[in-house]
């Protein structure tokens, strides 16, 4: 797919590429309108207005597609496009941007089955990829996401099952990781 289409991989699969753990069931991508047209010609495309995205299935796998000036994410897509990196042949957001996108997903899906997976991805990024927290702070300020650092701290403090999902069951180790993660957050 990455050889045929120009897209930015976001969501759980982008987290997986960065951390090498916890795969995702569906694929989330960002594309420009030209690429959306190519997808439309090749696959059945469904517009989901209330979620401001498009959906399709490719080889039985659900793909959520986000486009500039239509899709709503924590950070404008045009800004995400400027803050990417390449990894294993895929273009993905920088870790700080991906962390914010995962926080947005967690807030949007709060109290659903999928929000726990979002929290797992958030912790996984923090533990295994160490995003640049100065860049994170700068970005949340720039886009008026002032509640995000506080929510990030809450996610770290309240995490229990999320650590189990990551295979971390030793309570001492969990406590040490939480302490280290909180120390890494800036006020």
Q: Which role does the model predict for each range below?
A:
Residues 1-187:
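Compositionally biased terminal segments of proteins
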């Amino acid at each position: 797919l990455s050889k045929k289409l120009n897209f930015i991989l976001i969501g759980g699969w982008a987290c997986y590429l960065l951390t090498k753990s916890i795969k995702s069931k569906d694929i989330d991508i960002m594309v420009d309108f030209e690429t959306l047209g190519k997808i439309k010609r090749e696959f059945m495309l469904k517009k989901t207005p209330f979620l401001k995205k498009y959906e399709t299935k490719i080889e039985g796998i659900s793909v959520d597609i986000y486009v500039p000036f239509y899709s709503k994410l924590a950070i404008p897509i045009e800004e995400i496009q400027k803050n990417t990196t390449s990894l294993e042949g895929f273009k993905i957001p920088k870790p700080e941007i991906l962390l914010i996108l995962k926080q947005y997903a967690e807030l949007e899906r709060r109290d659903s089955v999928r929000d726990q997976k979002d929290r797992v991805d958030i912790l996984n990024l923090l533990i295994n990829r160490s995003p640049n927290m100065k860049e994170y702070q700068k970005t949340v300020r720039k886009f008026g996401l002032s509640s995000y650092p506080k929510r990030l701290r809450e996610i770290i403090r309240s995490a229990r099952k999320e650590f189990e999902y990551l295979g971390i069951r030793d309570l001492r180790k969990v406590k040490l990781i939480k302490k280290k993660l909180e120390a890494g957050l800036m006020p």
